Swiss-Prot record:
The keyword Iron does not apply. GO terms for cellular component: host cell; host cell cytoplasm; host cell nucleus; host cell plasma membrane; membrane; viral capsid. One of its GO terms (molecular function) is single-stranded DNA binding. Belongs to the begomovirus nuclear shuttle protein family. Keywords: DNA-binding, Host cell membrane, Host cytoplasm, Host membrane, Host nucleus, Host-virus interaction, Membrane, Transport, Viral movement protein. Binds to single-stranded and double-stranded viral DNA. Interacts with the host nuclear shuttle interacting (NSI) protein. This interaction may allow NSP to recruit NSI monomers to the viral genome and thus regulate nuclear export of viral genome by NSP. Pfam families: Gemini_coat. This is Nuclear shuttle protein. It comes from Cabbage leaf curl virus (isolate Jamaica). A motif (Bipartite nuclear localization signal) lies at residues 21-42. The lineage of its organism: Viruses, Monodnaviria, Shotokuvirae, Cressdnaviricota, Repensiviricetes.
Length: 256
């Protein structure tokens, strides 16, 4: 793990000659009498707080999490702050273990579509919640996250299997997909959302790193994450005039 240092121009097979009086050139050992032990180079590591398993909770809801039909939105999972108040982190990196979520999506009719027989048509559509890992987090040229269409090609792809577009596969990978195919006869419908995904396992450990350039900016927002951010994409596809409102709670288990 640690590279061996070699002397330039000297190999192990070369014979070394030692003069007889070399022993007289050895330095004299002086015992310290102050009773204090010298601190080795590893003392700094012992001064740092020990990393431990923790969980950070987050609720995502509100006006910014309401989608009209045939629309999508993107957001991120907040990571812990560098500090002493738990849940926290003691380093500029954490190990991501597991992400679980639970919540609801409410489908509402915006405008009643009446067919020729005078019957109000159903609201039929597909709701998707997609969790994505961003290996190299940084804002796009527009100053925001990549959109659903940029990541997966088009929103209509949510009807099938979602895959990262070829040009972004080196940066992103899909961690979890939750899909609900809905048919609503009433004006409103509430649907439960629940799932969990393992991020690190025995064969692979996923570590997230932070920039932490200034003391006041040692937080867990996307702009301060330098490696392995977690993004969430919501999408509601329907031909009916409707909207989808989400309320989802996330719990991130980590070592930090």
């Amino acid at each position: 793990m640690y590279p061996t240092k070699f002397r330039r121009g000297v190999s192990y097979s070369q014979r070394r000659f030692v003069s007889r009086n070399q022993s007289s050139k050895r330095g004299t050992f002086v015992r310290r009498t102050d009773g204090k032990r010298r601190k080795g180079p590893s003392s700094k590591a012992h001064d740092e707080p020990k990393m431990k398993l923790q969980r950070i909770h987050e609720n995502q809801y509100g006006p910014e999490f309401v989608m009209t039909h045939n629309s999508a939105l993107s957001t991120f999972i907040n990571f812990p702050v560098l500090g002493k108040i738990e849940p926290n982190r003691s380093r500029s990196y954490i190990k991501l273990n597991r992400l679980s979520f639970k919540g609801t999506v409410k489908i509402e009719r915006v405008h009643a579509d009446v067919n020729m027989d005078g019957v109000i048509s159903k609201i039929e559509g597909v709701f998707s919640l997609v969790i994505v890992v961003d290996r190299k987090p940084h804002l796009s040229s527009t100053g925001g996250l990549h959109t659903f269409d940029e990541i997966f090609g088009a929103r209509i792809h949510s009807h099938g299997n979602l895959a990262i577009t070829p040009g972004l596969k080196d940066r992103y990978y899909v961690l979890h997909v939750l899909k609900r195919v809905l048919s609503v006869e009433k004006d409103t419908l509430m649907v439960d959302l629940e799932g969990s995904t393992t991020i690190s396992n025995r064969r692979y450990n996923c570590w997230a790193s932070f920039n932490d350039l200034e003391h006041d900016l040692c937080n867990g927002v996307y702009a301060n994450i330098s490696k392995n951010a977690i993004l969430v994409y919501y999408c509601w596809m329907s031909d009916a005039m409707s909207k989808a409102s989400t309320f989802v709670s996330y719990d991130l288990d980590y070592l930090g």
